[in-house]
């Protein structure tokens, strides 16, 4: 990790030996990493659910790898600890039925399904959508454009989903019920 930080920012290496112990919560760890400008590791775990203090984390890590528990607070093991934290969060969220996401923008997009927020509006008719890609596809209704054209029979479609269903006719594939 020292070499990695040296390659990215030589001024941070001299501070590696002086790092304070890891904070007590994951929120604190995230803040801890942000304060030290470790941009490469701050996004390792961005959970919706934050577990109990590091006592549980130490127990979790011990169950998986007993050699890492004694080193949890050492700066050289922060990155590996964060990987264990990510695994801990994903497992905990799955147990509690909490949805987790790969991309940082995904929770915000997913929230729209619950709030009913539809920020993308058609200028022609005012119909609103949750995603800009859906609006782009919808706009073809007003223009008369049918971007999906079958090369075998020449039939054209506004929606890619309709086109994909149509392709099954030519392939002989049975429809999905």
Curated annotation (Swiss-Prot):
Q: Zn finger regions (C2H2-type) covering which residues?
A: 99-114, 120-142, 148-170
The UniProt entry, under Pfam families, shows:
zf-C2H2
**GO CC aspect terms:** nucleus
Q: Which domain of life is it from?
A: Eukaryota
Tell me if Endoplasmic reticulum is a UniProt keyword of this record: no
Report the main location listed first in the record: nucleus
What's in the keyword line of the UniProt record? DNA-binding, Metal-binding, Nucleus, Repeat, Transcription, Transcription regulation, Zinc, Zinc-finger
Gene3D superfamilies xref list: Classic Zinc Finger
Protein name according to UniProt: Putative zinc finger protein 826
Traced from the root, the source organism's taxonomic lineage reads:
Eukaryota, Metazoa, Chordata, Craniata, Vertebrata
**Gene encoding this polypeptide?**
ZNF826P
């Amino acid at each position: 990790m020292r070499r990695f930080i040296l390659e990215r920012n030589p001024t941070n290496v001299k501070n590696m030996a002086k790092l304070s112990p890891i904070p007590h919560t994951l929120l604190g760890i995230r803040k801890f990493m942000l304060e030290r400008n470790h941009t490469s590791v701050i996004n390792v775990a961005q959970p919706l659910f934050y577990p109990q203090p590091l006592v549980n984390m130490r127990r979790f890590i011990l169950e998986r790898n007993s050699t890492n528990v004694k080193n949890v607070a050492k700066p050289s093991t922060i990155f590996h600890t964060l990987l264990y934290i990510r695994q801990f969060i994903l497992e905990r969220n799955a147990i509690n039925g909490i949805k987790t996401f790969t991309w940082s923008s995904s929770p915000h997009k997913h929230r729209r399904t619950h709030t009913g927020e539809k920020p993308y509006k058609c200028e022609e008719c005012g119909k609103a959508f949750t995603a800009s890609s859906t609006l782009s596809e919808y706009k073809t209704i007003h223009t008369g454009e049918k971007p999906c054209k079958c090369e075998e029979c020449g039939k054209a479609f506004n929606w890619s989903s309709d086109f994909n269903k149509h392709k099954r006719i030519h392939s002989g594939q049975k429809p999905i019920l």
